[in-house]
Swiss-Prot record:
Fe cation binds at H517, D520, H605. It is an enzyme of class 1 (oxidoreductase). A zinc finger (PHD-type) spans 322-374, 1206-1260, 1416-1471. Binds 1 Fe(2+) ion per subunit. Its EC number is 1.14.11.67. GO terms for cellular component: chromatin; nucleus. Belongs to the JARID1 histone demethylase family. It comes from the Eukaryota. This is Lysine-specific demethylase rbr-2.
């Protein structure tokens, strides 16, 4: 066992964004309004992290302490506390001290197999991420796509779920593609510390390519599935999901096939068998579905997979078999036809008909979309819960559980772990990836098999405590008895229902959990902790159930969206603190041994165990549940969940026993039957209108049919009152879902079955009515007795009591009132104790204790007088009551003083004083008066907040300018009306000011309305001067003007960095001068979109000027692309025209993947890297720095490439077929390539034969310098894109002149070393513009310096020139996946794999990104190459100096560094006495 783990847990990269925007008025608890606010949409997914790392416990639910008399009847006591307790969802009841039932189980003989729970697989947010990843992998795998998790240059696995959520927050893949926002997506994804030098281009290309190839087809498949008609149910899938409903209801047996799957469904649905078909090799022809000779699909045809029966052969012996594609319905291209690998599925598709399209027949398994969907639906159904083989008894499990907890927390006794520490640790564990925790839980053990913790009536009670066992075997709170108490409607079932009427027991250990759920049929439940440590509960009141469901949908939309009945599976946990932050009221209960917990109808509840314990639970259903139960049936029908029992059947079982029903039960059954009759009349009228023939109507005793054979095939409701039948296909639905019964038959073919004639129902209704009248007579007599002015005599009360005892109606409340009057003295003592000792007995103030039963100060006096008049001696209790009354009088006196001098006291003072008064728990009229004072103080605060509102000088530039809290006309009127109740001078002054401000604001609203008749910038500035003073006002047209101002301010802030201007909102000069400024295309587009949102600027002169600028920039991009970009380009224009930024990682030996750019030219994509620069000066300085670095590092690149050999080819050495003569070496970087992996460039025609440049060194087509200069004519002079091209032209002229000077000096005999000439030649070859003036000199020098190279490569170069151009370019180059088949990394283990693959990089410097002139100074190499860029890697000396070095400065590649056991620098090697394990060359 391990010790306690560390605190820091990486949790919430998987959490979805849930921020929403709203402008509606919110109401506080006291009914007053709050100013509206607007949240920021699209928040980060890490926003929930603190809820798990620093868990905040929800408030505690009430604890109830019944007296022995109250405890005698559990149903009545629950009914008594229900008005107050129900809103908490779950409450605790502590029984009287004399309730000590013996534990009736032999711990040694009690054996069970607990299930294993993996805590980090049950939390909703984490579970959604894991589910998404597994579904994505399965979809790609079965769709025939080679899928691997993308890895960035640092070896980090890209979090695809997080990437998916970010793309969805940006509007989805289509919008991101259209709006060219992949850079924004990457920026959102990458950590902030990696943004110092912008977003790496390779990463943008990586995520764009992977998303479009693997994730978007998966999302598209989900959308298409959602758009299909969801009306048809998938019976097999529903049964599968039903098995994973971890509810207390009995597991349904497998239903018989009543749906006729051998008919039309064969055509519609693909079988869900999980048996895999035979694997297909690449050369094997697939055998898809077949057609008969007339072109129609053959039913039952299975291709080569099927073993035909003799009947099939006879039926089809004359049919000519033909394979065909179910998408295009064609049988051509049989070698490209795929057959689903699921045994028994006929579905076939061409590779080019698949979505996504497949380039070739896949080697692995391929499944049709329907079978993929079937597999997809099963993912995640039972995650987190696994069956175990180890069997325990209670003693051995106790030993295991206690040892596990002690080992985990590092203590020697389980009692030494605090509740708070354990609770915080639990919520960290549910999201822990680094240290997953698995525990065991003996859950849902049925007592009929393993035994109950309570003695049972049917058990044999022996031993010295046999009488005690017999006593508790009959106790009302014995969970074996509660469901069948006469007041529980479940008692009318003749047989028990496992988990509902027959208890289940639970053996828990530390952290074992039960996830969020409601009870079956929304019944009550009761749980008793027999022994052991605490059980922690969280509850949500039934009235807040929909809030809970909506919150969980926001947190995990992927889970709730794919499972209609997610909330009926006990498999999903969610953080209560997080749910509370989303507006869900949640309360907590700590259940100790010997305590009961009650859950109320539709109350969601969840929790965990602090350690070993043994609990028992069962359901019960008082009469008030009946209406909730019917509502539940409708809810189950909506999500197509099976019922545990038929609600209507239960009702009629009660009606059959009407002689035994009490008044309240009779009334409830009467109301329910009335609804049933009304519904049946409507349905039978509808059946006649539907066209079901009268001869097809029959009466059926549904209760005699097994439940699984009388369920609606669509909504799964167990039918009892009526049903529709399709005789031909043996199908059944409820009348409401008649349109899902059959697709081929008509209502004339249907059969309508019903349980009761309408006359029978009416008769039963009348009989129930008579019984309500009889019992009502008893009620009237009882009421008359209590309304008499004189105290009723004892004799009539006893007579009335005897009448009720002989009756079957059991009017318990009235009988107890009679008994209470008979025991007046006892009642008075109980009242006194309740007043004096309430804090001990209730712990929390609840309405149950203070609503109907609370007395006032006069009542306390009367009680004292009553007790003084009794014949018994109660002086001690009377003295305590008198002291209590004196305290109340003192409090009331102080209340009068505070109200008369309220200006001296703050609102908090009054609130604290009110709390003191509430502690007395009696009616005090002063409390209401004090609350009014508090209300007026709150009113003053809100009024002052408005009246003190003043505009600030630059408020328009505030980030939250548009979203500040403001007030509507109705808000202020309501505030004025509320304040008018007070007559104080202070209030009157505030009201007058509010009225004046409101009048002025309404005038401004009228002015704002007129503005939009003819908006303009000039008018906007003028009107805003007046409106600024009423900025507090929130009305439609002022809001619109405010939006316009905010939009103008945003646009101005975007332009100010480019074209500084004076303060104010005048944009005209700036917008009209944009063409001359250093603006980028991306910023121009962003400005245009901002203008389109503004009614003032949209289609204005200024906007038209901006659109013209964008059009000119697009034309410029098209001209430049035509000159520079080859037909199959793997670089965008920026990467071609700019200096190279890939030299450092290449020198380190990293593999940099290149992605095909596509045929279309998009200005946003071609120049998107320019976004990273804040100014033109910064961009040009960056270009200069890259150019300087190139001269320092390129030799290192050559050394690395030479050492790699053909591993540097774009196939990464995977192509072994070419001979040595078919290999080309790049004249510049010396990387080697197979000829078949290369492309011919027209630029090679200008160079000597045999001269070759690789795809990295020759990125463009090398246009002539004059053509490029001409392309700049008419382009915006100041745009950064044009400056970048001009910079390249200028560079070309300089290096060409330098080349010519070196060559001329060499020819004239002047000093011009070979190295100088080689460098000049290198610079000329590296420039992406060809200057013809330098071409002859370059050719001359190439012949002189590289003669042997040209001769060696002549044959391979000729082969390249003669080879035809590829018709379809590769999607990517230098792709590791094309070189080897690697095992797919497990997302849950990505952190550990990362640390392993970066053994040396794990120590790589804290400087993730090198700045250009500064950060390289920290490198301690003797000759630092001064690299910088996005991915400069460092290594630390493992010897004594601990200095840091650039990897490329120490003479090793990154792979070599990672493979070293340790690294020692040269300085440490010089001082070492023994040989080092590695050598340094820095």
């Amino acid at each position: 066992m391990r010790g306690r783990r560390q605190e820091d847990i990486a949790t919430t990269s998987s959490a979805p964004s849930t921020s929403t925007s709203h402008k509606k008025k919110t109401v506080s608890s006291n009914g007053s309004f709050r100013p509206r606010t607007q949240s920021n949409p699209g928040g980060k997914m890490e926003m929930y992290d603190h809820f798990y790392k620093n868990f905040q416990r929800p408030p505690m639910a009430p604890v109830y302490y019944p007296t022995s008399e109250e405890f005698a009847d559990p149903i009545e006591y629950v009914a008594k506390i229900r008005p107050d307790a129900e809103r908490y969802g779950v409450v605790k009841i502590v029984p009287p001290s004399d309730f000590k039932p013996p534990f009736a189980i032999d711990k040694e003989k009690f054996t069970f197999r607990p299930r294993t729970q993996k805590l980090n697989e049950v939390e909703a947010i984490v579970k959604e991420k894991h589910t998404f990843i597994e579904r994505l992998v399965n979809f790609n795998r079965y769709s025939g796509l080679q899928f691997e998790f993308p890895v960035d240059r640092d070896g980090n696995v890209v979090d695809l779920y997080r990437l998916h959520r970010i793309v969805q927050n940006f509007g989805g893949c289509e919008e991101v593609n259209d709006e060219e926002r992949w850079r924004d997506v990457a920026r959102e994804y990458l950590p902030k510390e990696q943004m110092t030098r912008g977003v790496p281009s390779y990463f943008i290309n990586l995520i764009r390519a992977h998303y479009n190839l693997h994730i978007e087809p998966f999302n598209r498949n989900l959308k298409e599935k959602a758009m299909k008609n969801e009306d048809e149910s998938d019976d097999e899938l529903e049964e599968l999901k039903h098995k994973y409903q971890h509810h207390h209801g009995t597991m349904r047996s497998e239903p018989e096939n009543t749906d006729g799957k051998n008919t039309e469904d064969v055509e519609e649905e693909c079988p869900m068998s999980m048996q895999s078909g035979r694997r297909r090799s690449k050369n094997k022809k697939p055998v898809p579905a077949k057609k008969s000779s007339n072109g129609t699909p053959k039913k039952g045809s299975r291709g080569k997979k099927n073993s035909k029966t003799e009947e099939d052969e006879e039926e089809n012996e004359d049919v000519i078999e033909q394979v065909y594609c179910v998408s295009c319905n064609e049988g051509k291209d049989e070698d490209l036809l795929l057959l689903c690998d699921i045994e028994g599925c006929n579905s076939g598709r061409h590779t080019y008909c698949c979505d996504p399209v497949l380039d070739e027949v896949p080697e692995g398994e391929w499944r049709c979309p329907k079978c993929i969907e079937s597999e997809d639906a099963k993912i995640g159904l039972d995650w987190g819960f696994y069956d175990a083989e180890t069997e325990y008894n209670l003693n051995t499990f106790t030993e295991f559980a206690n040892k596990w907890k002690c080992d985990y927390f590092g203590v020697d006794n389980v009692s030494k772990v605090s509740c708070d520490a354990l609770e915080k640790e639990f919520w960290k564990n549910v999201v822990s990836h680094d240290n997953p925790v698995a525990v065991k839980y003996g859950a849902d053990l049925i007592t009929s098999r393993v035994g109950s913790g309570f003695p049972r009536k049917e058990d044999k009670h022996t031993g010295p405590d046999s009488k005690l066992k017999q006593q508790y075997a009959n106790h009302a709170w014995n969970l074996n008895n509660m469901p069948v108490l006469s007041e529980s409607v479940l008692s009318y079932f003749n047989t028990g229902i496992s988990g509902m009427m027959v208890p289940w027991v639970y053996v828990g250990m530390c952290f074992s959990t039960f996830c969020w759920h409601t009870e079956d049929h929304w019944t009550y439940s009761v749980n008793y902790n027999h022994f052991g440590e605490r059980k922690i509960w969280y509850g949500v009141g039934g009235d807040d159930a929909e809030k809970f469901e909506e919150a969980l949908k926001r947190l995990a939309p992927g889970l709730t969206g794919r499972q209609r009945d997610l909330f009926h599976h006990m498999t999903t946990a969610a953080n209560p603190s997080l749910l509370r932050s989303l507006g869900v009221p949640i309360y907590s209960v700590h259940q100790n041994a010997g305590e009961f917990v009650i859950t109320f109808p539709r109350a969601y509840h969840a929790g965990y165990n602090e350690g070993l314990n043994f609990a028992e639970a069962v359901n019960f259903a008082p009469i008030d549940w009946l209406a909730k139960g019917r509502e539940c049936v409708q809810s189950y029908s909506n999500v197509r969940r099976y019922l545990v029992f038929s609600h209507d059947e239960l009702l009629f079982k009660m009606i059959e026993a009407m002689d035994r029903l009490g008044l309240s039960t009779t009334l409830a059954a009467y109301d329910e039957l009335k609804r049933v009759i009304e519904k049946q009349k409507r349905l039978r009228q509808f059946i006649a209108q539907l066209g079901v023939p009268a001869r097809n109507v029959e009466q059926v005793a549904f209760e005699k049919i097994p439940d699984e054979q009388r369920s609606c095939r669509f909504c799964k409701t167990t039918l009892f009152m009526c049903a529709l039948i399709c005789n031909k296909h043996k199908r059944m639905t409820c009348v409401e879902h008649h349109d899902h019964l059959c697709k081929t038959c008509t209502p004339k073919d249907y059969k309508y079955q019903y349980r009761y004639e309408i006359d029978n129902l009416t008769h039963l209704f009348d009989e129930l009515g008579k019984r309500t009248v009889d019992t009502a007579g008893w009620q009237e007599d009882d009421d008359d007795m209590y309304t008499q002015e004189e105290m009723p005599k004892l004799e009539p009360m006893v007579d009335l009591y005897n009448v009720e005892e002989q009756s079957s109606s059991r009017q318990k409340n009235q009988v107890h009132n009679i008994i209470a009057i008979q025991h007046t003295a006892k009642s008075a003592i109980e009242k006194a104790n309740q007043l004096l000792f309430k804090k001990v007995r209730t712990r929390t103030k609840t309405r149950c204790q203070r609503a109907d039963t609370r007395t006032d100060a006069d009542g306390v006096k009367s009680l004292i007088e009553q007790m003084q008049g009794m014949d018994c001696n109660l002086s001690g209790l009377i003295d305590k009551l008198q002291k209590f009354l004196d305290q109340i009088d003192a409090w009331r006196s102080k209340a009068q003083i505070m109200m008369s001098q309220e200006h001296k006291y703050s609102k908090d003072d009054f609130e604290h004083f009110i709390e003191e008064g509430d502690e007395y728990d009696i009616k005090l009229s002063e409390i209401e008066e004090l609350r009014k004072v508090v209300g007026m103080k709150e009113w003053s605060e809100r009024a002052i907040e408005i009246t003190s509102w003043a505009p600030t000088s630059n408020m328009e530039k505030d980030i939250d300018f548009e979203y500040k809290m403001r007030y509507t006309n109705k808000d202020v009127i309501a505030l004025i009306r509320e304040g008018s109740r007070s007559s104080s001078n202070h209030t009157s002054q505030l009201i007058a000011k509010l009225q004046h401000m409101l009048a002025e604001a309404n005038k401004r609203e009228a002015e704002a309305t007129e503005y939009f008749d003819n908006p303009s910038l000039d008018k906007l500035q003028s009107i805003w001067k007046n409106l600024r003073t009423s900025d507090w006002f929130y009305e439609p047209y002022i809001n619109l003007v405010r939006f316009e101002i905010g939009q103008i301010a945003k646009i101005k802030s975007m332009i100010d960095s480019t074209i500084p201007a004076l303060s104010g909102l005048d944009l005209k000069p700036q917008l009209l001068r944009l063409g001359d400024s250093s603006i980028t295309f991306a910023k121009a587009v962003e400005l245009s979109k901002a203008c389109e949102l503004s009614k003032t600027l949209h289609k204005s002169q200024e906007h038209s000027s901006l659109l013209e600028l964008i059009n000119r920039m697009n034309l410029f991009t098209e001209r430049i692309a035509k000159l520079f970009k080859p037909m199959n380009s793997y670089h965008n224009l920026f990467e071609i025209v700019s200096e190279r930024d890939d030299l450092t990682p290449l020198a380190e030996g990293q593999v940099l993947q290149l992605y095909y750019q596509g045929e279309t030219i998009n200005s946003g994509n071609e120049w998107h890297q320019i976004k990273d620069f804040d100014s033109l000066e910064q961009m040009l300085h960056h270009q200069s720095s890259l150019r300087e670095m190139q001269s320092r590092i390129f030799e290192k690149v050559k050394q690395t490439n030479s050492a790699r050999g053909l591993e540097g080819c774009c196939c990464l050495g995977g192509n072994k077929s070419d001979s040595s003569e078919s290999v080309l070496s790049c004249i510049m970087c010396e990387s080697q390539f197979h000829v078949r992996c290369c492309e011919w460039s027209t630029f090679f025609q200008h160079l000597p034969k045999g001269c070759f440049m690789c795809v990295r060194c020759l990125r463009g087509q090398r246009p002539v310098i004059d053509d490029v200069a001409n392309a700049l004519n008419g382009t915006p002079s100041g745009c950064m894109e044009t400056h970048l091209v001009r910079n390249l032209i200028q560079k070309s002229r300089i290096i060409t002149q330098n080349l010519m000077d070196c060559s001329n000096k060499r020819q004239s005999g002047e000093v011009a070393s070979d190295e100088m000439c080689k460098k000049a030649l290198f610079d000329w070859l590296a420039c992406e513009i060809m200057n013809p003036n330098g071409l002859p000199k370059a050719v001359e020098l190439i012949h002189e310096f590289f003669g042997d190279y040209l001769e060696k490569q002549a044959s391979a170069a000729l082969e390249l020139q003669q080879r035809p151009v590829k018709s379809k370019p590769s999607a990517s180059l230098f792709d590791p996946k094309l070189n080897s088949k690697r095992k797919r990394p497990n997302p849950s283990q990505k952190d550990s794999s990362k640390s392993k693959s970066r053994k040396r990089q794990g120590q790589i410097s804290p400087i993730d990104y090198c700045e250009e002139e500064t950060e390289f100074k920290s490198c301690q190499a003797r000759s630092c190459l001064k690299p910088f860029g996005d991915s400069v890697n460092w290594v630390m000396c493992d010897a004594g100096c601990k200095n840091w070095f650039h990897v490329i400065c120490v003479g090793f590649t990154l792979r070599e560094i990672n493979d070293m056991h340790e690294y020692r620098c040269s300085s440490c090697l010089d001082h070492a006495d023994s040989p080092a394990s590695s050598v340094s060359t820095e």
